[in-house]
Amino acid sequence: MKPNILFITIDALRADKTYGKNKTSTTPHIDSLISKGVYFEQTIAAADQTGSSLASIFTSNFPITFGINQFNFSSKTETMLNIFKKSGYYIDGFVPDHDFFKSLTENFDNSDVYQAEKKASWKRLGDGLGAQIIDRITTNKMKKPWFLYIHVMDIRPPFEVPNEFRDEK
């Protein structure tokens, strides 16, 4: 029997703050997931932007390989999600509505795309997104085996420059 896979990415999370002997943040739930699953102790970002970095994670290629910059990602590009789908996995996800994720979710069996146009409206885990995710997993709404991808934006908004200030020098 194939295992179910829960794949979580957290926008703007620094690994050095949340794991290892020198960590400076308290993360009991992440620690619990790590103890029960797989954690990669050495990670190096392929790019300094979310879209480019995630494209590298999902394709195992550097962004320069196929000209990805920011959220410019073709749904025709082979990803690990396509491979899991071909292997019989039900693909589901909770992602923001950036262009990158729109392309990525075109091949999903189901997805909840939450609004990102107005940064204040990004769903946070504590504002209902977490409950939706738990409900999806515990009520067997996904066919087995499943691959559930979650991209969390909870720690991102404090670092986001408001639109009205983006063009200022």
Q: Which residues make up each language-model segment?
A:
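Catalytic domains that recognize anionic headgroups
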Residues: 1-169
